[in-house]
From Swiss-Prot:
HAMAP family (alphabetical): UPF0276
Source species: Psychromonas ingrahamii (strain DSM 17664 / CCUG 51855 / 37)
Pfam families: MbnB_TglH_ChrH
InterPro entries per record: MbnB/TglH/ChrH, Xyl_isomerase-like_sf
Protein family: Belongs to the UPF0276 family.
Protein name: UPF0276 protein Ping_0944
C-alpha cells in the first residue's frame, strides 16, 4: 500500500483518463475507483489499474454492496471485494447508505432507505457482516435524496451517527449530497453538519449537480456531470475552516467526463482552499 498524506486531495479514476494518467503522471494525492469495475482479473480495467497503482495511493468506493437491504450481503460480492482489497491494499474502502438488490436481483441505482429503528438494525447487521468479512473498517456515505419516507423516526444525520456508533465504521461525507438534499427538502445545511459526528469523517466528496424542473419547482440531481458549484465550494471552505479535519478530499466526475485537465483544475482548487486556510490560521 502506497502511503498517503493526511488531508490530501485526489480525483476519481475513470476509464477515459487511464492512458493520459500513465503518460503524464500528474501530482495527485490519491485516486479513487469504483470497486466493482475491477473485480474481473482479466479485464482492461484491471490491466490499467495494476499499472496506475504503482504510482498513486488508491481508495475503493463501492456502489453494489447494498448494505441497506433487508437481506444479507451477497457472499460472492464480499469475496470479490476482499480479493481486490488484498491485492491493491487501498487506503480507504467505502460504500453507500442505500440498497440496490433484492432476491438476487440487482438494480443499477442507489435506492433510499427509511430512517427507522428497523432499517437501522438491518443496516448495522449488514455493515458488521461486511467489516467482519473484510477484516477492516469501511466508510459509509450520506446519500443524495429526492424523496422522504413518512415513517422515518429520526433525521438523516442522527441515523448516520447511530450507524457509526453501533458499528465503529467511518464516515464519507459528501458535501454535494448534503447540499442537493437540503435544497430538495428545504432543510439547513448548517444544522445537518452540526449534528454529524465530525470525529468520524475520514473522507469528503465534492461533485457537480444538475437542475430539473418538477411540478413547477426546481430539483437538484446528483449527476456528477458538471463542475462543482460555487455553493458547494463555499460549504467546503466553511467546513474545512471550522472543523479542522485531516479527512481526505475527493473530486468526483462520472458522467459527461471531460479531459483530465478539468479534473486537475478542480483538484487544485480544493488544494488552494486548504492552503489559504492554513495561511489564515498562521496569521491568527
Amino acid at each position: 500500500m502506497k502511503k498517503i498524506q493526511a488531508g490530501t486531495v485526489g480525483i476519481g479514476l475513470r476509464h477515459p483518463h487511464y492512458q493520459t494518467l500513465l503518460d503524464q503522471l500528474p501530482t495527485l494525492g490519491f485516486l479513487e475507483v469504483h470497486s466493482e469495475n475491477y473485480f474481473n482479473p482479466h479485464s482492461q480495467n484491471r490491466f490499467y489499474l495494476e499499472q496506475i497503482a504503482a504510482h498513486y495511493p488508491l481508495s475503493f468506493h463501492g456502489i453494489g454492496l447494498s448494505i441497506g437491504s433487508s437481506e444479507d450481503i451477497s457472499k460472492t460480492h464480499l469475496q470479490n471485494l476482499k480479493q481486490i482489497i488484498d491485492i491493491f491494499q487501498p487506503v480507504l474502502v467505502s460504500d453507500h447508505i442505500s440498497w440496490s438488490s433484492l432476491q438476487s436481483n440487482f438494480f443499477n441505482d442507489l435506492l433510499p432507505i427509511p430512517y427507522t429503528k428497523k432499517a437501522l438494525s438491518c443496516f448495522v447487521n449488514n455493515l458488521n457482516q461486511t467489516q467482519e468479512h473484510l477484516q477492516r473498517q469501511i466508510l459509509i456515505e450520506n446519500p443524495s435524496s429526492y424523496l422522504e419516507y413518512n415513517d422515518s423516526e429520526m433525521s438523516e444525520p442522527e441515523f448516520i451517527n447511530e450507524i457509526v456508533k453501533q458499528t465503529g465504521c467511518g464516515l464519507l461525507l459528501d458535501l454535494n449530497n448534503v447540499y442537493v438534499s437540503a435544497t430538495n427538502h428545504q432543510f439547513s445545511v448548517e444544522k445537518y453538519l452540526d449534528i454529524i459526528d465530525h470525529t468520524t469523517v475520514q473522507e469528503i466528496h465534492l461533485a457537480g449537480f444538475t437542475q430539473k424542473q418538477v411540478n413547477n419547482s426546481t430539483m437538484l440531481i446528483d449527476t456528477h456531470s458538471t463542475l462543482i458549484s460555487q455553493s458547494v465550494w463555499d460549504i467546503y471552505q466553511t467546513y474545512m475552516s471550522t472543523k479542522k479535519t485531516d479527512a481526505l478530499t475527493l473530486i468526483e466526475w462520472d458522467l459527461d467526463i471531460p479531459k483530465l485537465g478539468t479534473l486537475i483544475e478542480e483538484h487544485n482548487k480544493a488544494i488552494n482552499i486548504k492552503q489559504s486556510l492554513c495561511t489564515s490560521d498562521k496569521h491568527v
